[in-house]
Amino acid sequence: MHEAAIKSIDYSMVNPFAIRQENFPDEITFYGPGLKPHKTSEFSGSLKEFVSISVTGNNCALNCEHCNTKMLDNMLDLPAFKGRLFDMAKSLQENGTKGILVSGGSNIRNQVPLLPHIDDMKRIRNELGMVIRVHPGLPDEKTCQALAEVDLDGVMLDIIGDQETITDVYHLDATPADYETVLERLNRHGIPVIPHIILGLYFGKMNGEWAALNMIKKYPL
């Protein structure tokens, strides 16, 4: 469905909750973001239990309009730790951490350099039993093959369905088809995918979000 079609829908004829009941179980799981402390009347987020780690520090070749490396500033800096990823995870676990997100800045192809840390992730999984999720950008075939050996809890994957957003916001020489290729690649290797669609990513405008949804629905999640 095109974004413009939203305005033509007669929502008085639609029962959203009935549609939800027909397609999903009664239990809903909510996740609180872990990059910044937050608290509501019903929920208090903890930065200690699930920790984000940047394997590149605050360095990112894309330096895109989405975050201008600011997201990396809220992550633990692995290069500054001057140790291996396993050692950092073990130290975190000793202080109460249950899981980690392995992320970092991208190269010009929007790929986070995860391959040097695959063996450490395997050890974290097998020896420490911690939850491991990764944010890989647009991983190539070799990276997906390696990630499949880690037994990950999930891959956080931004899905973009609009060419202008990819070019103007991410400064990336890629197409929406490249994002679908990565979805196919991860599914083929049996890696659980947690797709993200960022509403208004094109400077606050809705561009390609429906296309991203249509892309995602082709694959089992």
Positions of predicted regions on the chain:
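N-terminal [4Fe-4S]-dependent radical SAM core
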Residues: E3-A61, E65-L76
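Structured catalytic core of nucleotide-sugar glycosyltransferases
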Residues: G32-P33, I53, T69, F86, ...
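A glycine-rich, aromatic-flanked flexible loop/lid motif
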Residues: V14, Y219-L221
